[in-house]
């Protein structure tokens, strides 16, 4: 049975379906970057409200700025913008839900003017983003907006025909300002530290280059709430499509699969209204920082620990890595002994319970989360997920063998060869330069840690860290992952550099 509006009434009983009249829903949210995560997260919270008979003015219009977004747009359009959320977990209470919160999907390359008009329409009150780290055109090491990118220069020269997210947002806000229309809130839903601030800095940097008066108006009137978002959402595979079809009879060309867990903590700073998402589990707060640091350092940082060591051992799925007792012990030890001591108190959160939940989520056998997904884009992820913990340890003068092992494992992983002789691609925009540095025969450590856009200045300046990194890398190269894990878990590598030097 093909998924579309006409067939909704024929869905099996166990499949949830929209309980509202989709034709009556206005699109108050424009979401740029419709992928799996948005469809499994923000759209689901909105769907829950719509099913309660609320949020009728907060439907979603999707937007694609890249040519690659056409496949998603055409797929959803062929299904009347319906799709299936297919929860995968190890318990029996997982849900299958047809979602109708997205009511339209615009492609910038088809009609940029139509998109600008949509953004400038007073009905649009929130513009949300999942555009990944690279979409913010911000240098990872300096945090500065990169105005020299060709697409940015194009948008500054052609403000009526933009190509980038900031070109579109700025032109739409300029039109709203000229018409006396309130601005929209810009809400980043990307998995970035201080994501709202990152979006604000990028948009204001662009606007300043275009029109100083417009820059000042945006700075004084547009809200950019920070948010912590969480839901493990693997890439949809043909196996998932077949599994959904077999289980429910639904023929969905692009369902989204996700774990049962989801969480969203948002700063309550919206300049033009918002849905009452708190009624369906969203937590609003004055400051998202402690929640953000907890999630990014414990969940994402531990993912990095599991992923690179697991890949070297030949594991291909997260649950396989967590079934490896030696590796799962290392991951929990990293959480307990390295990350937790550096975290501030998180209001309303029991950290021990939170860590137990993470281990359970990582071990989910049904979701088959791919190690390759977790390993991808390490040059962007590690500076955000692991290096803050390492910097805290360097500043505190404490031993750092586990944190350093994660980075040494990444370096070793970049060779593209696991310990069973299997190969894998390096999925990273910087793959060529990273592999070149990781495969040097001489001065490997100095050159690898000299990648300033990854490690910055402070970390390579720590002689203790450099010596520990060298030791852990040599161990991986000569003894292998298991012996290195055993040594690391059995000892605290000390901060005495002379002692370290004798071990290398």
Language model: regions and residue ranges:
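Substrate/ligand-engaging "lid" and interaction regions
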Residues: 1-504
């Amino acid at each position: 049975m093909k998924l579309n509006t006409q067939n909704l009434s024929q869905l099996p009983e166990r499949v949830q379906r929209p309980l509202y009249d989709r034709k009556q829903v206005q699109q108050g949210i424009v979401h740029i970057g419709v992928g799996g995560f948005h469809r499994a997260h923000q759209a689901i919270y909105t769907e829950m409200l719509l099913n309660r008979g609320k949020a009728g003015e907060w439907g979603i219009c999707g937007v694609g700025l890249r040519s690659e977004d056409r496949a998603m747009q055409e797929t959803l359009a062929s299904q009347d913008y319906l799709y299936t959320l297919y929860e995968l977990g190890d318990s029996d209470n997982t849900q299958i839900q047809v979602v109708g919160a997205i009511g339209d999907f615009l492609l910038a390359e088809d009609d940029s003017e139509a998109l600008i008009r949509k953004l400038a329409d007073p009905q649009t009150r929130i513009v949300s983003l999942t555009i990944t780290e690279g979409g913010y055109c911000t240098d990872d090491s300096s945090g500065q907006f990169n105005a020299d990118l060709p697409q940015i220069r194009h948008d500054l020269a052609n403000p009526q025909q933009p190509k980038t997210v900031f070109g579109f947002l700025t032109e739409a806000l300029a039109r709203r300002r000229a018409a006396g229309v309130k601005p929209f809130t810009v809400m980043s839903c990307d998995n970035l530290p201080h994501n709202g601030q990152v979006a604000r800095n990028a948009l204001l940097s662009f606007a300043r280059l275009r029109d100083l008066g417009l820059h000042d108006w945006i700075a004084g009137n547009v809200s950019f709430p920070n948010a912590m978002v969480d839901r493990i959402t693997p890439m949809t595979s043909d196996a998932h499509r077949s599994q959904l079809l077999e289980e429910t009879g639904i023929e969905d060309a692009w369902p989204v699969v996700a774990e049962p867990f989801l969480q969203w903590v948002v700063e309550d700073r919206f300049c033009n209204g918002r849905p009452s998402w708190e009624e369906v589990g969203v937590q609003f707060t004055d400051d998202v920082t402690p929640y953000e640091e907890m999630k990014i350092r414990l969940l994402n940082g531990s993912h990095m620990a599991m992923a690179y060591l697991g890949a070297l051992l030949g594991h291909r799925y997260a649950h396989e890595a967590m079934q490896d007792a030696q590796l799962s012990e290392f991951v929990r030890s990293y959480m307990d002994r390295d990350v937790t001591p550096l975290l501030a108190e998180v209001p309303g959160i029991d950290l021990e319970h939170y860590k137990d939940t993470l281990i359970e989520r990582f071990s989910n056998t049904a979701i088959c989360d791919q190690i390759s997904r977790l390993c991808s884009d390490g040059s962007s992820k590690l500076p955000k997920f692991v290096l803050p913990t390492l910097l805290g340890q360097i500043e505190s003068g404490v031993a750092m063998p586990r944190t350093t092992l994660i980075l040494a494992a990444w370096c070793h992983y970049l060779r593209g060869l696991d310990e069973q002789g299997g190969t894998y691609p390096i999925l990273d925009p910087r793959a060529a330069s990273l592999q070149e540095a990781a495969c040097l025969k001489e001065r490997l450590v100095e050159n690898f840690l000299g990648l300033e856009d990854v490690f910055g200045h402070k970390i390579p300046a720590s002689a203790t860290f450099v010596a520990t990194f060298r030791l852990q890398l040599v161990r991986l190269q000569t003894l292998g992952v298991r012996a290195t894990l055993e040594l690391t878990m059995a000892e605290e590598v000390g901060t005495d550099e002379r002692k370290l030097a004798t071990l290398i």
